């Protein structure tokens, strides 16, 4: 796994100055001794990270003697964290450590969180079992188990039950997830809705930004694209343009760091 992280660094999938955070434990960088409560949120990527920002703001306004550790796994989410966490005092971002027993235990010993919140479908067995062993409360918020994922979990129902029962509380984002956890006889499961829908979106700002581009024009939107799909979308644009000369194609990649690659593909096709 360590070799894999170094390989990802070589192919520019990891931050060259911070990739070791996934291998070595890190210290909190706030020196205020009075701030003795640490809340750890793990949100794997951009969507999960943005969904917890309102929660962080509420917690910070309610209790000023808190410090927050936010961990993510992707390069793109770390860039968003720089922006979002500037608005939240006493918040710190780190990359999530590899889910290897001795690494996660070192991480827990260094940071000593008072509680850990996992967001969405982030299930890391070694960290979960270690936190339980250390007596650290763990909560799964916005829990999301798809029908495909639930079938995989049911290959090992005993293991699934053991893992999910480590959580002190599971807040399901939908009834499908709640029913799945209930069928596993997981305790402390509640349906709380999708917290991603709680974010306030400035619709007017988005409309004003795009109105001149899209007004009176045909357009189509390719959302959450992956490698290999972008070229197909661009070639589709060329085909559509023959019939609809003013067509606008909008591509939103799943991982924002691929934007440069999409731009290069566009230039190669003279777009």
Predicted regions and their residues:
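Active-site and donor-binding regions of nucleotide-sugar-utilizing enzymes
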Residues: 6-204, 225-227, 238-244, 254-258
